[in-house]
UniProtKB/Swiss-Prot annotation:
The gene is speE. Transmembrane segments: none annotated. This is Polyamine aminopropyltransferase. Keywords: Cytoplasm, Polyamine biosynthesis, Spermidine biosynthesis, Transferase. One of its GO terms (biological process) is spermidine biosynthetic process. Residues 5-238 form the PABS domain. One of its GO terms (cellular component) is cytosol.
Amino acid sequence: MAENTMWHETLHDQFGQYFAVDNVLYHEKTDHQDLIIFENAAFGRVMALDGVVQTTERDEFIYHEMMTHVPLLAHGHAKHVLIIGGGDGAMLREVTRHKNVETITMVEIDAGVVSFCRQYLPNHNAGSYDDPRFTLVIDDGVNFVNQTHQTFDVIISDCTDPIGPGESLFTSAFYEGCKRCLNPGGIFVAQNGVCFLQQDEALDSHRKLSHYFSDVGFYQAAIPTYYGGIMTFAWATDNDALRHLSSEIIQARFHAAGLKCRYYNPAIHVAAFALPQYLHDALSAQ
């Protein structure tokens, strides 16, 4: 790709977004994906897979703080965490901030993602790959959760959209495997797209997850990079109290953890579970 050109996202056919490319840092097709990292004056370094923006330096903290601190603080005493995907290392970075976590396992299908992100997105991982609690497994996520003998308190599915390599992480086989290796009272979370534009993804996930978990819902966060703005995260557990904890309980856990965040706070945590009426209506109609 030539520099000083426009890069257009290809996720949607009728609308979309573009970024000015100031400098291409990396562009190569691996066995699994078409990977590119380029620099943009407004958003810093931008990573895209198969024509879809995955992360930018400017606003990645919103996505990663909400994907980690919401389930970890809701759980309250998570010791073993599994990350599916997350090769850029930012999810790992946020999990390592929880000192009570004893083991962090990350399953990434493509070793190339990890290697080039260590080089080209160092602010994302911030040295977290060297944390002694961390183990990297190069494997398919569905295979891992259905074969592993390990169990986890929190599972974070940092999956791409349900097309191509990411499609398997939205299947019943994957959700059943996650239930299989979750400890009692454990929490599963996953990105579920921008609900206003990709509502079918949320409805499909809710329908499938409900076969394996007694409490299934969603929470949301405003993330500018993802076209449409409001990202939806799937939530599944067998402890229905965890989705309804008071701000006082979350505040106490937040304080005890010694976290300092740029987006997440206890009030945001509680408010994130308030969903728009159109989503309530769509879920009720299923």
